[in-house]
Amino acid sequence: VTKSRLFALILTLSLAACGAKERSVPDLKNVEEKLAFSCVYEKAHLPKLDEQADQLYRYARWLYKNQLEKEDPLRYPEMERYYRIATAYGHYKANLDLREMIGRGTAWSADPVKETLDLTQDLIDRGIPGGYYDMGRYLKAGYGVKQDEELANRYYRKAADLGNPEAQYLVGDKLTNLTIAHPGPFAIGNEMKKCAAEQGHGKAAVEYGYHMIYEEKLTEAVSFFQLATKWGDPTAALNLGNGFGRITTENKQRNDLGLQQDDERQRRYLLIMGVLSDYSYAHPSVPELDEIVPLPPAKLPPWDGKIQWLKDHEANIAPPKPSEALLEKLAKAKGLDPKTGRPLGAEHS
């Protein structure tokens, strides 16, 4: 689950939480103090999504995408409705988006702090790694719980051990910031970043690529820049574009990745970089990158100049809209108001 928006949400909510009754959370004493880390992928701990709930979530995400292009306040109740019903069926992605809406005040809540913590605790109770990461954020910010950085770090580490890439990057970054003067933690931090990179964390992939350059492993650096570009990181695409460009004495230290000059490869990477940069607010990605600009010695295939994400973004085709009959069935089975997705009898605002 992507969490970049959640951090902004926490900052938005922190003031609102001041003065609220603090909740006690488990101290995770069972989280080992040792630094040793084994790479685990988050997907091993994520339950299969309910197909009908996922239909609701996908339609709500399409509405959200259109909000990014042109905000319409009338869309928010509809989004809340879909997210709430999907969340009731254990949809952990809808859970995150619902919390974000509550935090921004675009979804109704009788008690925003309590509901946000309840939703997060539900993920933890089901062993979903992102729940531990999010609770770590709340502990660090003191949002509805007693501010406790040490305990926050335990929650981050628990999330990292369960495979959450955001937690792996965060903990890994703390360890690599100790610098090479602390070789043990530094090495473990880089292993955490590598694990996050392999799971779709673009920034982790870029930074691990830089570490490979430091170790003079240019082939590995190029591979991780390629991976980061797939995940949507424009810096990685720029690095590869420059790497396939003309290397001079002036730019050698900055651009040389041990690659042979290739003008067409450079052109393609720079085009991709432009899209990733221009649309960064919408989180584009290029999973088909190896079909557009495979690394040498593979030959370049023909390319029409557009990544699939941009084609889909411009087409803006709506996923199937959930029927009212489906919404009513799903909502009533969970004791929710089919019209709002809120608990039956909840006070409306």
Where are these regions (language model features)?
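Long C-terminal extensions of eukaryotic subunits of large macromolecular complexes
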Residues: 19, 293-349
